A protein has these predicted regions:
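Short alpha-helical transmembrane segments in multi-pass integral membrane proteins
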Residues: 1-28, 85-157, 207-263, 320-385, ...
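Generic alpha-helical transmembrane segments of integral inner-membrane proteins
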Residues: 32, 36, 40, 44, ...
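Short runs within selected transmembrane alpha-helices of multi-pass transporters and secretion channels
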Residues: 78, 153-172, 180-188, 213-229, ...
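Small-residue hotspots at the loop-to-helix junctions and early N-terminal turns
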Residues: 54-65, 147, 151, 214, ...
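Hydrophobic/aromatic residues within transmembrane alpha-helices of membrane transport systems
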Residues: 33, 45-49, 60, 85-90, ...
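Small-residue-rich hydrophobic transmembrane alpha-helices
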Residues: 57-117, 161-180, 281, 292-358, ...
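Helix-terminus/linker motif at the lipid-water interface of multi-pass membrane proteins
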Residues: 36, 40-58, 127-141, 199-208, ...
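Transmembrane helical elements of multi-pass membrane transporters/channels
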Residues: 26-45, 153, 187, 220-224, ...
Length: 469
């Protein structure tokens, strides 16, 4: 009898009905599709470059790791305001949404200008940080050359990327997830087509190698920006915030202060987290250029599978954030419990598929056998820890939806710099432990975060409306 009651209680707390899952999937699936297609095309892009040569692939992958830091800076910069956007939309306060949009604009402009200046001045030195491991002088010189070629062109794509993130994040926070997905699909098709034409020099197009890949990416970003911006302003009946959006670019001082208080830790968090990921890759790269190549392969494959827990985490921020903005705390907690459980269950299934297929993916690349073998085991290790990452991602966005950005800052970037990076740094430089063991130790350390996240979510420290005043 008691077991029956326990099962009933468990189902009520963690399992939703069909209507609940349809609601969650309505938000999550478009994000999954957009991110999935993006990452799948990144995979194809990666394979296309990889077929030219290992040095070209490694050079482009190092630059993409550096640009990833910028991408997350933008994500962190707009996400701080996004907490307010979701709650303003929950209150149907369209002027509040406009003001948060304007804040996002200025924050993104500042970050983009700073990033372009940084890469123009010390870009070559940053690439060289990843070329200190084993490898011939010629291999290192070629990797640096191709990386610099790729970087110089990719910088032209930062402004449209910035605008896409500002508009798409605002649309999603207002419940419109389909249009950003459609724009992403079109951009991806453009990217894939011109990758093929420009990397290999098909028809009358020149054979540009890594430069062709960069040009295709930049072109696709301008196409995506044109679609998202154009659609938003043509459909003001659906996007009420777009009416009079640029009548002024001023942001009220009191709102700026509130967003900075909540959003600055989030910006620092994303920036420090992304730079920590770049540092982890640099630590692994000490073990040689084959490790750089294998990490590029495994990370590209991992990103295709990670879309599930990333999209479900984003859905937590949107759905729970709107419930908090509407003041329905009881429903917010109940919804959050079910969404976390759903994310972990989904990712357990995905991880099984990923683990079984891990030996097949590296075979797609034209690289040496050692790099392929390393990539296979890196993918397997990541698959094993995917349910853990799903739980962490969902709890992170739960805390963030309630404005607990200081906690997420400590929970995320402070942890990775104080625990994960030191583990990788010490083990890679001062021991003879195999790089796969180092990689697994870094993943295992995140169990500490699981415990912290579980306690904080259960205590309900995130249950608050931050825009009611």
């Amino acid at each position: 009898m008691e077991r029956t009651k326990e099962r009933s209680s468990f189902r009520k707390k963690f399992i939703g009905d069909r209507k609940f899952y349809m609601m969650v999937l309505a938000v999550a699936v478009p994000i999954m599709i957009q991110n999935g297609i993006t990452n799948f095309v990144s995979l194809l892009d990666n394979i296309m470059i990889g077929w030219i040569g290992t040095e070209q692939m490694s050079g482009a992958s190092i630059v993409n790791q550096l640009i990833f830091v910028y991408n997350l800076c933008i994500f962190g910069g707009v996400s701080g305001a996004g907490i307010f956007t979701a709650q303003y939309f929950g209150q149907k306060d369209h002027e509040g949404v406009r003001q948060t949009f304007r804040y996002k604009f200025w924050m993104a402009v500042i970050l983009t200008i700073g990033t372009i200046l940084l890469f123009f001045t010390v870009g070559e030195n940053l690439i060289s940080m990843y070329l200190q491991g084993e490898g011939t002088a010629q291999q290192i010189a070629d990797t640096l050359k191709y990386g610099k070629q790729y970087l110089d062109i990719m910088l032209l794509g930062l402004p449209p990327f910035m605008m896409v993130q500002i508009y798409s994040s605002t649309l999603r926070e207002c419940g419109e997830t389909v249009l950003p997905m459609k724009a992403g699909v079109v951009a991806i098709c453009v990217n894939l087509l011109f990758n093929y034409l420009l990397i290999y020099g098909v028809f009358f197009f020149p054979r540009l190698g890594v430069r062709g890949a960069a040009i295709a990416t930049v072109l696709s970003r301008y196409v995506e920006a044109a679609i998202v911006i154009g659609w938003t302003h043509r459909h003001t009946e659906k996007n009420a915030f777009a009416k009079g959006l640029y009548s002024t670019l001023k942001v009220p001082a009191n709102l700026t202060k509130k967003i900075l208080v909540k959003g600055t830790p989030l910006l620092f968090n994303e920036t420090l987290w992304a730079s920590a990921m770049a540092m982890l890759t640099q630590c692994y790269s000490i073990r040689g250029l084959n490790v750089v190549a294998s990490l590029n392969i495994s990370n590209t494959i991992n990103n295709v599978f990670n879309i599930v827990f990333i999209a479900l985490g984003d859905s937590v921020a949107i759905i729970v954030g709107q419930l908090l903005g509407a003041g329905d705390m009881k429903k917010a907690r109940d919804t959050d419990n079910k969404m976390i459980a759903f994310s972990v269950m989904c990712c357990t299934c995905v991880a099984m598929v990923m683990f079984v297929m891990a030996p097949l993916f590296p075979m797609l690349y034209n690289t040496n056998a050692e790099a392929r073998e390393l990539a296979k085991y890196l993918i397997m290790i990541t698959a094993f820890f995917m349910p853990q990452n799903a739980f962490l991602h969902a709890t992170y966005f739960t805390l963030r939806s309630g404005g607990k950005t200081i906690i997420t800052f400590l929970f995320d970037s402070v942890f990775i710099w104080c625990v994960s990076v030191p583990i990788a740094f010490v083990l890679s430089r001062y021991t003879g432990i195999h790089v796969l063991v180092i990689y697994a130790c870094v993943q295992l350390a995140d169990l500490i975060k699981c415990v912290i996240g579980f306690v904080l979510v259960k205590k309900g420290v995130w249950l608050q409306n931050i825009v009611s005043s």
